[in-house]
Design a protein with these regions (language model features):
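Catalytic-core signal marking the mid-to-C-terminal active-site face
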Residues: 205, 221-231
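An alpha-helical repeat/solenoid feature that recognizes helix-turn-helix modules
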Residues: 22-38, 87, 91
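Hydrophobic side chains in beta-strands
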Residues: 33-34, 178, 221
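Aromatic- and carboxylate-enriched substrate-binding clefts and catalytic-loop regions
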Residues: 3-10, 19-27
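Accessory "access/gating" subregions that flank catalytic or transport cores
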Residues: 12-13, 33
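Glycine-rich, charged/polar anion/phosphate-binding loops
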Residues: 15-17
Length: 231
């Protein structure tokens, strides 16, 4: 497991591979992007950091470095810093990894609060982070994906400068299709649909004309049948 995917329980070393970095980075979630870690509690515990406001849970998304570190957001602004501001593609990588963890792994991390019982509600965590992701991708009331944004205010740090406005680095559609709606890509001819929508959040949804393995699919949910009048 690549030296326990670092001695710091699932977060890899930087630089010298024999010495763990003194800061957790969101790149530590990337092994789940490829379903690499074993389905064991010692690796699952890493996801508690995605829910921790001192870890990677910020008001406008998942920063690339943990918020508790003393040098978080300390390297200035506007020079491609990766010390805490939100980069949409990095967030997308974390969310893809999280969806894989939810769908493909049985062992889940313990609840964040010491006093709580049971496991961390990963479905709610994913949905809440997706809501942040959706809300962040706008500027002046219009859809927008920029270079990177402030993790607490949602302000695009490079505004609409050319360098920023050409940063089309979101996998937004994939996150909706394979994560929220839950059409899970497969090599065989099985259609697997596993939405990540906590109870009570949505009363209906419809994803129409999705081309998949040579077929056009419609995936819909209607809580009481009054929206689409089918099924």
């Amino acid at each position: 497991q690549a030296k326990e995917v670092a001695t710091n329980r699932s977060f890899p070393p930087s630089g010298d591979a024999a010495v763990s970095a003194k800061v957790r980075e969101a790149n530590g979630f990337l092994p789940w992007y490829f379903n690499l870690p074993a389905d064991e509690a010692k690796f699952a515990e890493a996801w508690k950091q995605a829910a921790d406001s001192k870890g990677f849970s910020a008001p406008y998304g998942q920063p690339p470095a943990e918020r508790r570190h003393p040098q978080f957001r300390s390297h200035g602004v506007g020079k491609c810093e990766w010390d805490g501001a939100i980069w949409p593609f990095a967030t997308a990588q974390t969310l893809t990894a999280m969806a894989n963890f939810i769908n493909n792994y049985q062992v889940k991390p313990c609840a964040l609060a010491v006093s709580s019982k049971g496991s961390l509600d990963m479905d709610s965590l994913y949905f809440n982070e997706m809501e942040k992701y959706v809300q962040s991708q706008s500027m002046r009331g219009k859809p927008y994906i920029g270079e990177y944004l402030d993790e607490t205010t949602g302000y695009w740090l490079k505004g609409d400068q050319e360098r920023s406005r050409y940063y089309n680095h979101s996998t937004f559609c994939d996150l909706i299709i394979t994560g929220i709606v839950g059409l899970r890509p497969r090599a065989d001819q099985t259609i697997e649909v596993r939405p990540i929508i906590p109870a009570g959040k949505w009363q209906y949804f419809c994803l129409d004309k999705v081309r998949y393995h040579g077929h056009d699919l419609t995936i819909l949910y209607d809580q009481d049948g009054s929206r689409y009048h089918v099924g």
